Curated annotation (Swiss-Prot):
PROSITE patterns: HISTONE_H2A
Entry superkingdom: Eukaryota
Organism this protein belongs to: Gallus gallus
InterPro entries: Histone-fold, Histone_H2A, Histone_H2A/H2B/H3, Histone_H2A_C, Histone_H2A_CS
Residue numbers of N6-lactoyllysine PTMs: K10
Cellular component terms (Gene Ontology): nucleoplasm; nucleosome; nucleus
Covalent crosslink: Glycyl lysine isopeptide (Lys-Gly) (interchain with G-Cter in ubiquitin): K14, K16, K120
Gene Ontology biological-process annotations: heterochromatin formation
Post-translational modification N5-methylglutamine, affected residues: Q105
Annotated positions of the Phosphoserine modification: S2
Record Pfam families: Histone (PF00125), Histone_H2A_C (PF16211)
Protein name: Histone H2A.J
Gene that this polypeptide is encoded by: H2A-IX
Length: 129
């Protein structure tokens, strides 16, 4: 018996998540697991879940920023589904991406057909002259 215990062994480095390695907030490990379990392909490369998590994080940040602006325009401090709907439908690219998506409690965009608007008539002063 040497009596040394664990003093001479190598110190293992602290575990670092793949999300933190990639500088992401979204979970790379969970995306990888879901890609494997989803029967999308027989094998999933190491870079695929990182890329997909980055894309999901970017899209989420974009939608939340626009929804936050919509909430601020309505003098609210909390984002509700209506703000998400307004943000997505007023952005051309997001509207194209999420065109077939229905957002619960989102409502519709305010829109009045031009034909239904009252016709512009001359003012009273112009008629009297």
């Amino acid at each position: 018996m040497s009596g040394r215990g664990k003093q001479g062994g190598k110190v293992r480095a602290k575990a670092k998540s793949r999300s933190s390695r990639a500088g992401l907030q979204f979970p790379v490990g969970r995306v990888h697991r879901l890609l494997r379990k989803g029967n999308y392909a027989e094998r999933v490369g190491a870079g695929a879940p990182v890329y997909m998590a980055a894309v999901l994080e970017y899209l989420t940040a974009e939608i939340l920023e626009l929804a936050g602006n919509a909430a601020r325009d309505n003098k609210k401090t909390r984002i509700i589904p209506r703000h998400l709907q307004l943000a997505i439908r007023n952005d051309e690219e997001l509207n194209k991406l999420l065109g077939k998506v229905t957002i619960a409690q989102g409502g519709v965009l305010p829109n009045i057909q031009a034909v239904l608007l009252p016709k512009k008539t001359e003012s009273h002063k112009a008629k009297s002259k």
